[in-house]
């Protein structure tokens, strides 16, 4: 039996996205810009470089108000050209 994400979450809830992308200066700004469109707020994402320095991992936490917001952000963050993966 497959459990759906919206069955596990109670809204509003704190939800963290981990975005992996190329180690370019604009990565953090692009991630925050997309998040701001769907969950306006004051964000301080954390950035961790990969061991070889080719990629950065950007973690950003929002207060999600509904499942559609969570799903839309997964999709739009993944559509950023320099992003390789969103968890």
From Swiss-Prot:
Gene3D superfamilies: 3.30.70.260. InterPro entries: UPF0250_YbeD-like (IPR007454), YbeD-like_sf (IPR027471). One of its GO terms (cellular component) is cytosol. HAMAP family: UPF0250 (MF_00659). NCBIfam families: PRK04998.1 (NF003447). PANTHER family: UPF0250 PROTEIN YBED. Belongs to the UPF0250 family. This is UPF0250 protein Ent638_1166. It comes from Enterobacter sp. (strain 638). The lineage of its organism: Bacteria, Pseudomonadati, Pseudomonadota, Gammaproteobacteria, Enterobacterales.
């Amino acid at each position: 039996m497959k459990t759906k994400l919206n069955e596990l979450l109670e809204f509003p809830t704190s939800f963290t996205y981990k975005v992996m992308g190329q180690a370019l200066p604009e990565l953090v700004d692009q991630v925050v810009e997309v998040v701001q469109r769907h969950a306006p707020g004051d964000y301080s994402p954390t950035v961790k470089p990969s061991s070889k320095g080719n990629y950065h991992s950007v973690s950003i936490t929002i207060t999600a108000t509904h499942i559609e917001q969570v799903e839309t952000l997964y999709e739009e963050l993944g559509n950023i050209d320099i992003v390789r993966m969103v968890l």
